[in-house]
A protein has these predicted regions:
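Glycine-rich beta-to-alpha transition loops that act as phosphate-gripper elements at the mouths
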Residues: 1-4, 28-29, 50-54, 105-113
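Catalytic cores of alpha/beta
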Residues: 10, 54-65, 106, 110-126
Length: 154
């Protein structure tokens, strides 16, 4: 959609909507330099992704190109997956931290207070998406999502 719209129009629409960051999950790194720099010139942070199989060299490149944040994908797979092997992620998260000066948050499969606390101890924060969507779909009463998020922070 971004390329079809045109990068200049996309950046203008983001700027008009006062968007301050965009996640770019499928933009090839080697083709993204100009686009990411144009975003940053308009104070829009390009949020780039790293994964457990991302090399140290590539993490360094991503760190230099990213805006205010890197999104560290916790698993190879789709969002909402189980994190039963999360203890094996310590080396990966240390690799991201050691090879990037850019703050990073971890996402994919994070759904409990224990998950959030665990990932917060190895990163700059945790992203909870699918679990919030599931709460909204399960219960539309006012305050359900707010209470869920408050409990994640405890």
């Amino acid at each position: 959609p971004i390329l079809r719209m045109g990068t200049k129009d996309f950046i203008k629409k983001c700027n008009d909507a006062e968007i301050d960051g965009v996640i770019l999950p499928d933009l090839p790194l080697d083709e993204s330099v100009e686009f990411c720099n144009n975003l940053k010139n308009k104070n829009i942070s390009p949020i780039l992704l790293v994964a457990p199989n991302t090399s140290e060299k590539r993490i360094k490149k991503i760190s230099k190109l990213a805006g205010d944040l890197i999104y560290a994908v916790s698993i190879l797979g789709i969002t909402g997956n189980d994190l039963s092997s999360k203890n094996n992620l310590k080396n990966y998260l240390a690799k991201v931290k050691d090879n990037s000066e850019t703050p990073f948050m971890v996402g994919f499969g994070i759904s409990t207070n224990d998950d959030v606390n665990w990932f917060n101890s190895f990163s700059d924060g945790a992203v909870v998406g699918s679990a919030v969507i599931k709460k909204v779909l399960k219960d539309t009463k006012k305050g359900v999502v707010e209470n869920f998020v408050k409990n994640l922070k405890k």
